[in-house]
């Protein structure tokens, strides 16, 4: 369901999106004193060389997030660019891809497209791309794995915060729980939220209006928790 964000909602640590990267983790690799265990001898470097095959797997996953606005009729003019989803892991192990147990909230940009046909109905759509390490305490993606979340923190919910701008200059952030969508596609996918704009009253006044923006004061740069 859709809830209006209130100031007393618990906001987890705030992060920007991680860059996309991949890693390989070959197992059971040993240093041997038997030349027969190597592939060839490098005459120039004077060392025995063994080729190691490794499959690069993603350590960062991509979600495409779309907020479908039905019955807008020009009421909502855009988003503020401070869209965020909470409940994602704040770090990962580069070798194993196993994510940590520290939930965070990740920001991403959204842009508005108007008069788009969605499931046979015309709507405005606010959409954006989100990159994340995935959910907390989660195994990495492998080709044979399923996308359903099997980690140890299913109680950590995911909330989508969408700051909306209205035609009278006011703003309001709505909150939608997207836990089921995130846990059913924990290695990335498409998150879709449908909103009937006729059920959202336009805030009175002008300018900032009645708005909750999930940010913090006295911001300082924080490094991601990435284990080697």
Functional labels for PLM-detected ranges:
Residues 1, 76-184:
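Tryptophan-paired
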Residues 1-59:
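Short, low-hydrophobicity acidic/polar segments
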Residues 13, 174-176, 193:
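N-terminal compositionally biased, intrinsically disordered segments and leader/signal-like regions
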Residues 48-50, 59-63, 79, 156-160, ...:
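Residues at beta-strand starts and edge strands
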Residues 55-70:
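A short, Gly/Thr-enriched small/hydrophobic beta-strand-prone motif that recurs across taxa
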Residues 72-74:
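Primarily extracytoplasmic ectodomains and periplasmic/lumenal surface modules that are beta-strand-rich
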Residues 187-228:
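Hydrophobic, glycine-enriched assembly/anchoring segments
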């Amino acid at each position: 369901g859709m809830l209006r964000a209130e100031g007393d909602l618990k906001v987890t640590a705030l992060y920007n999106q991680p860059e996309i990267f991949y890693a390989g983790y070959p197992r059971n690799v040993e240093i041997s004193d038997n030349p027969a265990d190597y592939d060839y001898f490098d005459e120039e470097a004077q060392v025995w060389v063994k080729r190691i095959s490794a499959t690069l797997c993603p350590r960062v996953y991509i979600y495409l997030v779309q907020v479908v606005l039905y019955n807008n009729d020009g009421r909502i003019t855009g988003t503020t660019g401070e869209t965020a989803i909470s409940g994602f892991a704040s770090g990962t192990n580069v070798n194993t891809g196993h994510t940590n147990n520290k939930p965070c909230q990740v920001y991403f940009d959204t842009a508005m497209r108007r008069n788009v046909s969605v499931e046979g109905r015309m709507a405005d759509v606010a959409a954006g791309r989100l990159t994340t390490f995935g959910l907390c305490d989660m195994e990495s993606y492998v080709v044979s794995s399923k996308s359903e979340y099997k980690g140890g923190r299913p109680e950590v919910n995911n909330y989508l915060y969408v700051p909306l701008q209205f035609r009278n200059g006011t703003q309001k952030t709505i909150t939608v729980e997207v836990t089921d969508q995130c846990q059913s596609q924990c290695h990335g996918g498409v998150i879709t939220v449908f909103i009937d704009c006729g059920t959202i009253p336009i805030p009175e006044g002008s300018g900032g209006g009645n708005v909750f923006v999930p940010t913090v004061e006295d911001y300082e740069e924080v490094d991601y928790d990435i284990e080697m």
